[in-house]
């Protein structure tokens, strides 16, 4: 990241560790090893597993609109532990209420050094607590009129299913998140900075996540 306000990690096998997993690692470390408490603020496109971990520790997870300015405002005005967004911007209350990728990397290194465990081992321990999951995203470039048509269909709840995946509920904090089953969901949202329609998904495995994204893409482009 050009100005180092975001963080990305790779494990020992060279596999990318996304921001959703980094946020979970930071929450666990700050609570269990640093004794820090407070609310966790995350953007609408972050994994819902964050709430599961917060529930485990008896702390609150508040979901904000997408954009770190919304998270920053909440962290300043309320007692906070951490704020994070899907794009890798994370802040912790023991530092400043603003994104700092270098600081987050140092905290993760400290976590690994103190426990003597690898990233994979630490992530597996979190999976043992809240269940495994995978997140992914498609960025679909399309004409503006097609993008607006899809968003209008979301507004009027036209999408009842995406292929074999039946919609059981909808959340509309910032975009349209369609709840599926077993902690799975898919979210449709126009980019605020590029001529794109972003489609996010969460499921138990990477393969299932891609299957949901493919089914959603086929449905909205039909």
Q: Where do the PLM segments sit?
A:
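Short beta-strand segments
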Residues: 1-2, 189
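Short, glycine/acidic-enriched loop or turn micro-motifs at the edges of active sites
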Residues: 2-6, 88
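Short, acidic/small-residue loops that bind anionic groups at enzyme active sites
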Residues: 16-37, 65-67
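Short Gly/Thr/Asp-enriched flexible loops that form oxyanion-binding sites at enzyme active sites
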Residues: 5-25, 50-51
